Amino acid sequence: MIETASLPEDQRPLAPPDSHIFRTFVNAPAGLRRYRAMTKFIREESHVPPRLREMALIQIGYVTSCVYEYTHHIKTGLASGVSADDLRAIADETDGIETSLEPLAKAVLRATREITLGFDVSADVFATLQRELGDEQLMELLFSVVTYVGTVKLLLTLRVELEERYQTYLQQFPIRPIRS
């Protein structure tokens, strides 16, 4: 992880001192710029409802036990309409426990788990998502999921440490051991 002050002046905005992910990813500044452009699109321009998008990204962090991804998106999710009940439902859905989530949210979570743990989405889930979201939102959801699955792989490979201020989210919503 690079100290922001040691970076050339033009790269400092890429790696705020309080962001471990960007202080790590800035080792490849051109790649980080493109990564940030994609994540900006996902957050600010995608037509996927923010609650569903964030539930998918939280699911990725949860199912991979990537506390960095999980806690950062809990914070973003809570600001985007994800409730504490939704967060508990993500854990329950992962364990195969019935929840009161609406069918579309369940399909988003299942598709996210299938992509994260495998390589594709089952036909029935894909059909549900296509029917409920339409082609554009479905494609944007898939862009979001595969982008953040890649992010998790980088975070885990590079062992990016969680900033202390995010520990509270992990304490409130711990990652349970995944049932097989």
Please annotate each region the language model reported.
Residues 1-180:
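Hydrophobic alpha-helical segments
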